[in-house]
Amino acid sequence: PEAIEVLTLARQMSELTSGKFDVTFGALSDVWKFDHDQDDSIPSQAQIAARLPLIDYRRLVVDAQAGTAFLQTKGMRAHLGGIGKGYAVDRAVKMMRDAGLKDFSVQAGGDLYVAGKRGDRPWRLGIADPRAANGSIFARIELSDSTFSTSGDYERAFVKDGVRYHHILDPRTGAPAGLGQPAWPWAVAVLARGGALADGLSTAAMVAGPRAAAALRRRASNRFTGDSTQRLLAYASVRWLCA
């Protein structure tokens, strides 16, 4: 049931973002190597082009009632990077709530949910400068009963010949989001009620870039009307985009 649930959410997020987040980007997972197999190699345009026809979330068919999911084209792959950790946070939060806990935090990678208070004060989170060598904090926020999700080009990345390559791939081009575009944000942060929502939107906003991110935020707000915490702020000093 959990597999079908998270695939359903991933399919919905793909549709919501018009493919900026695309659950079928897994077709590129062995072309670019940013995980345990990272070797700083750059795939050829021919290698990337051969995989692009295999990326299309509309060809993932999920039948929640029957408990089935399948990809309509041979060679396609579903990949839960960009939403899976957020979903895991949501599940953990539900377990904590069901256990009667009111004040707690749950974190999985760049996805953090905080509930209630930390002792006698609100939860305070520091936002790190993604280019600072010492991990210095450039902004702080207070929040409760919300998920804070970050996506950026500073982890699972490498620099080669002065160009930064990172693991957040644009499903439309098969290349790292914003590659070669100096005005692209270094990182994106999304504040939302749900972890899967925040995780998927931060990934999509990183792919969409600064101009299109506002439209994503409006679209999500219209669809998730109960999620009033979403907001868009720009921190130009370190090129963070907070949604």
Question: Which residues make up each language-model segment?
Answer:
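Mature catalytic core of soluble alpha/beta enzymes
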Residues: 1-243
